[in-house]
């Protein structure tokens, strides 16, 4: 599987026109079950809203879904989905809640409102790249701890909090395939005594 871009957690964007409020809530979702669960969560929290429009994109099966939820066809879910498509992001869902202000907006006004609210939620989101990574671990003497940690950080790895016992255990993540130069540096630092264990590759934001 290739690297891909998505968002971390959730984000919100709002737009108001003629007293109608459009609240776009965006969330990471890597399955249809998670996307639907987020939709139901937003619906439950906004039971008095006139509409809860949604759109989502999933890597799994290249699925894309949307709903206008009672708005005129192609004025709500379609423009929201198009914003997600143009972003290049996947594994995410957006639910746009509309609180009606009493004034009809027309086709153009609705498209603009749902597009803008979704775009603002994307602007507020933290975008991450999901890559194939490995988690590695090495135990060193206290005398080598700081130098080993500096080597790991200089390699661009994500270093977790060390564990201190009679020695120091360091654990970190880095993209799969980038670890050989660092492992060689650690062997040189420890004069060949470093025993590094590595996990199977897995996909995670990096």
Where are the language model's segments positioned?
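Flexible, glycine/charged-enriched surface loops at secondary-structure junctions
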Residues: 51-52, 125-132, 160, 195-197
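Active-site beta-strand/loop microenvironment that shapes enzyme catalytic pockets
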Residues: 76-125
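Short glycine-/aliphatic-rich beta-strand segments at the starts of folded cytosolic domains
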Residues: 127-144, 172
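Conserved short beta-strand edge segments in small beta-sheet-based binding/regulatory domains
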Residues: 159-163, 190-206
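Terminal, non-globular segments
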Residues: 172-181
């Amino acid at each position: 599987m290739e690297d891909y871009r998505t968002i971390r957690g959730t984000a919100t964007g709002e737009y108001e026109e003629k007293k109608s409020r459009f609240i776009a809530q965006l969330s990471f979702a890597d399955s249809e079950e998670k996307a639907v669960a987020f939709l139901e969560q937003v619906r439950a929290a906004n039971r008095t809203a006139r509409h809860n429009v949604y759109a989502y994109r999933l890597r799994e099966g290249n699925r894309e879904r949307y709903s206008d939820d009672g708005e005129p066809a192609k004025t709500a879910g379609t423009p929201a989905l198009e914003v997600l498509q143009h972003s290049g992001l996947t594994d995410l869902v957006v639910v746009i809640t509309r609180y009606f202000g009493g004034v009809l907006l027309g086709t153009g006004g609705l498209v603009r409102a749902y597009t803008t609210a979704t775009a603002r939620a994307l602007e507020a989101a933290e975008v991450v790249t999901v890559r194939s990574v490995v988690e590695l671990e090495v135990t060193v003497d206290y005398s080598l701890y700081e130098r080993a940690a500096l080597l790991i950080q200089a390699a661009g790895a994500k270093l977790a909090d060390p564990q201190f016992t009679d020695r120091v255990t360091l654990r970190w993540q880095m993209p799969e395939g980038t670890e050989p130069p660092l492992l060689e540096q650690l062997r040189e630092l420890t004069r060949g005594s470093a025993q590094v264990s590595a996990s199977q590759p897995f996909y995670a934001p990096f």
